[in-house]
A protein has these predicted regions:
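C-terminal end segment of the histidine kinase catalytic
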Residues: 130-140
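Two-component histidine phosphotransfer core
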Residues: 1-119, 124-126
């Protein structure tokens, strides 16, 4: 998890430079052990989707929130961004390939209990993953 988080933060530092004040970030990941297993390039594509579909189209930008927790052997991670209900009328340019790829990799590694859930509620778009896994011991 630590390496995945560092990669995501590096990516966002570039996007923050590009988008400026339009991109607001909120991280709630303190409960996630640094050694937790997560496939490489899982978080970054979720963040990229949040920026492309939730921040870039909005003149005022918005808040991307990353929430992660590890409890009772289950890891949950949600990336959310602003969602405009009127956007459903516009044709999507995306192929959902990143989400399909993440879902397939989670299933292959963590089995049928692994889930990727995408939903819209309360003016936000949520991409959430949940899977059982063992946490590696924290390094001193």
């Amino acid at each position: 998890w630590r390496e995945e988080l560092e990669l995501a933060q590096s990516y966002l530092s570039i996007e923050k430079y590009r988008l400026g004040e339009r991109l607001q970030l909120e991280w709630q990941v303190d409960e996630v052990p640094g050694g937790l297993l997560i496939p490489q390039l899982t978080l970054q594509p979720l963040l990229e989707n949040a920026l492309i579909h939730g921040i870039q189209p909005r003149i005022d930008g918005g808040l991307v929130r990353v929430e992660g927790r590890y409890r009772d052997g289950v890891f949950e991670l949600c990336v959310s961004n602003p969602y405009d209900p009127g956007a459903e009328d516009k044709p999507s340019r995306g192929t959902h390939q990143a989400l399909l790829n993440i879902e397939a990799r989670l299933g292959a590694i963590f089995g049928p209990q692994a889930r990727l859930i995408v939903e819209r509620r309360d003016g936000r778009h949520f991409s959430c993953l949940r899977y059982p896994c063992a946490s590696l011991p924290q390094e001193a």
